[in-house]
Amino acid sequence: VHLTNEEKTAVIGLWGKVNVEEVGGEALGRLLVVYPWTQRFFESFGDLSSPSAIMGNPKVKAHGKKVLNSFSEGLKNLDNLKGTFAKLSELHCDKLHVDPENFRLLGYILLCVLARHFGKEFTPQVQAAYQKVVAGVATALAHKYH
């Protein structure tokens, strides 16, 4: 992902304020509510019968945190996203058979959640920088599919 120094500063600066547990749980929960077909990958998580059940599900929250911790690793390695996410790409492709489009959808959801949490701080410029990052991460996660 090519980011200007200004964009890198904006992305890293905002990320330092992110509560990965809260934002991760909300992002994954919203993915499962907004795009219900993604729930099939999480059948072992128990009750996903309603939006409130999904958003309150401790396994959804825990996995959302795990997802954002991986995203944090990507932010530390913006120049090597494919390498950073190679094993996760292989897992999601070969073992879990996740449609790579879901990575893009989660990226869009993450942008919505960041905007909700950070309001005016999530300026159009910050959003543009994050859009590049989530697109790069989605591409890296889809790499093993090609």
UniProtKB/Swiss-Prot annotation:
| UniProt-listed Pfam families | Globin
Task: Please give the residue positions where the record annotates the modification S-nitrosocysteine.
Answer: C93
List of residues that carry N6-acetyllysine: K59, K82, K144
For this UniProt record, give its keywords in alphabetical order, as a comma-separated list.
Acetylation, Heme, Iron, Metal-binding, Oxygen transport, Phosphoprotein, S-nitrosylation, Transport
Please give the superkingdom of this protein's source.
Eukaryota
Q: Which cystines does this chain contain? A: none
| Tissue specificity field | Red blood cells.
- Write down any Gene Ontology CC term: hemoglobin complex
- What residues bear N-acetylvaline in this entry? V1
Residues bound to heme b are H63, H92
Q: Which residues carry this modification: Phosphoserine?
A: S44
Q: Which InterPro entries has this protein been placed in?
A: Globin (IPR000971), Globin-like_sf (IPR009050), Globin/Proto (IPR012292), Hemoglobin_b (IPR002337), Hemoglobin_oxygen_transport (IPR050056)
Q: Which biological process, per GO, is one annotated for this protein?
A: hydrogen peroxide catabolic process
User: Which GO MF terms does the UniProt record name?
Assistant: haptoglobin binding; heme binding; hemoglobin alpha binding; metal ion binding; organic acid binding; oxygen binding; oxygen carrier activity; peroxidase activity
Q: Subunit details for this protein?
A: Heterotetramer of two alpha chains and two beta chains.
Concerning its family, UniProt says: Belongs to the globin family.
What is the recorded function of this protein according to its Swiss-Prot or TrEMBL entry? Involved in oxygen transport from the lung to the various peripheral tissues.
Official protein name in the record: Hemoglobin subunit beta
